[in-house]
């Protein structure tokens, strides 16, 4: 009886991706192409890959392996734990840890051959004592040139460069800084930071220099130095404001339609009854909500961002653009599908939340945020599919 019962189900019900309430497709071929594009734009500089925050939410294992296979030999992560995970997928790469090192992490750093990026006097002192005891191991130095986040003060870095008393086991292989306004090419801050970093680069003669992340690469060769550090551009996001995005989309998020329902003119939709229907409508209830990173600020009405004049978000289903109706809830979002022909949509279809037809940065703008946050904020309920990159 059990065998007959199991045999009565169609084969596709065993395919987790095809039947998932939420799906995330990651195009590894597009990821590799985007890295090659950044490499070409970087000119003579080597091109690293930033894979922090689980490769911007898309999976450090698959993305890291793809980028390594594409040719990346320098990687940047945020934490020692991320670096340890990446090491298996990038066996001969240099892996820089942007948050540096804390006491107790020495073994992980040495065992996984990670390069801590030192950004404070405390980290410098601890690292010098560590290598004096354990022996030579490469490190990097982060110098603040105006961002006022992480980094050694400029004068301290210049003093360190000339400090003949520093131990021989102290072996910086890279000095880096980070631009505050690279996404706005006209900002005078870019040139000011460039001039400061040129002083740092000259002071640490013989040590590689790195200033540019994704947006900085687009500022041109003056900003490239020895190594560039693309991040968001690899994953298809916009790096520069107010210009066409040349990168290939990498991620596509989709939510399954649970139900399609009719609603009359004058009725309201979702919490707060703030979304008033001005005509008889058809509504599709999709299995995605703010628990999945589809933020409440993407709501069609009834929240402060909407009242400030931002347009609501939309999805695409079977080639048709459909706006969000009413407030996004924890697990569900309602889309107005009135203008989709009845024979072109049904329960079980998928609405593209962002992807090739709905740029992730456009969705982010509707939420009052940026593509970085949309990608890194994806929840745990997406069934993932990785499209393998061609050689």
From Swiss-Prot:
The active site is at residues 52, 271. It is an enzyme of class 5 (isomerase). Pathway: Amino-acid biosynthesis; D-alanine biosynthesis; D-alanine from L-alanine: step 1/1; Cell wall biogenesis; peptidoglycan biosynthesis. Pfam families: Ala_racemase_C, Ala_racemase_N. One of its GO terms (biological process) is peptidoglycan biosynthetic process. Keywords: Cell shape, Cell wall biogenesis/degradation, Isomerase, Peptidoglycan synthesis, Pyridoxal phosphate. The modification N6-(pyridoxal phosphate)lysine is found at residue 52. It catalyses: L-alanine = D-alanine. InterPro entries: Ala_racemase, Ala_racemase/Decarboxylase_C, Ala_racemase_C, Ala_racemase_N, Ala_racemase_pyridoxalP-BS, PLP-binding_barrel. Its cofactor is pyridoxal 5'-phosphate. GO terms for molecular function: alanine racemase activity; pyridoxal phosphate binding. GO terms for cellular component: cytosol. PROSITE patterns: ALANINE_RACEMASE. Substrate binds at residues 149, 330. CDD domains: PLPDE_III_AR. HAMAP family: Ala_racemase. Belongs to the alanine racemase family. Catalyzes the interconversion of L-alanine and D-alanine. Provides the D-alanine required for cell wall biosynthesis. This is Alanine racemase, biosynthetic. It comes from Agrobacterium fabrum (strain C58 / ATCC 33970) (Agrobacterium tumefaciens (strain C58)).
